[in-house]
Amino acid sequence: NILLSSTLFVLLMFQIIGSGLGCDMKVRGLDANMKKMILDLPNKKRQIVANGQQSGQPSAPNMKELHWNDEIAANAQRSGETGVFEPTAKSLRKTTKYSYLGENIYKGFYPDPIPKSVNGWYEEVKDVPPAVVKSFSSGGPMFGHYTQMVWANTEPLGCGLVTAFDRNSYLFCQYDPGGNYRSHPIYKQGPPASDCKNGKSSKYPGLCN
């Protein structure tokens, strides 16, 4: 039956084209240890910068400690489960509470995508001119992952993880407020934690609460 054969062919093609990553997911989401790691590693990187321990970068008086946020994490997880490895559309980088979220994404091999992603984003610091700290601009080498990770006012963080059967992991981390605003400072410059509005972090000296 030609009609039946054509219908089956269309259905098969729809399944192949529309399957995306969703049908090939092996692991969804982050366990407790992963959440702890994805929060601790960026805070330690922020701490290095805030304390003036990163060569070529000034210290920061106002860099906040990052905190995990389940609402943002759920939004980041939805982005990962679309099966499309590209920045989430700005219209989808928001929740009922947060109107605009910044984002970093990473693709790598399981089981250690988190340290690789954080270290990879941070390595962009080598391309950041000191002038960009005072006034962000995106021209030249790519360093937007690094600058988002150390954006001073960013505090709540949430990440989503998808691992496919080919062992590729897709990590989406979203931040509030989103950073990388042109002509805005990444952070103020001055003695570490000297401009903390709500006190200093006890866990990460050099950062603010």
Curated annotation (Swiss-Prot):
Expressed in which tissues: Expressed by the venom gland.
Keyword Secreted set for record: yes
PTM note: Contains 2 disulfide bonds.
Keyword Transport found: no
PROSITE patterns: CRISP_1, CRISP_2
Molecular function, one GO term: calcium channel regulator activity
Entry superkingdom: Eukaryota
SMART domains assigned: SCP
Location within or outside the cell: Secreted
Signal peptide feature range: 1-22
Family annotation (InterPro entries): Allrgn_V5/Tpx1_CS, CAP_dom, CAP_sf, CRISP-related, V5_allergen-like
One Pfam family in the UniProt entry: CAP
Name of the protein: Scoloptoxin SSD346
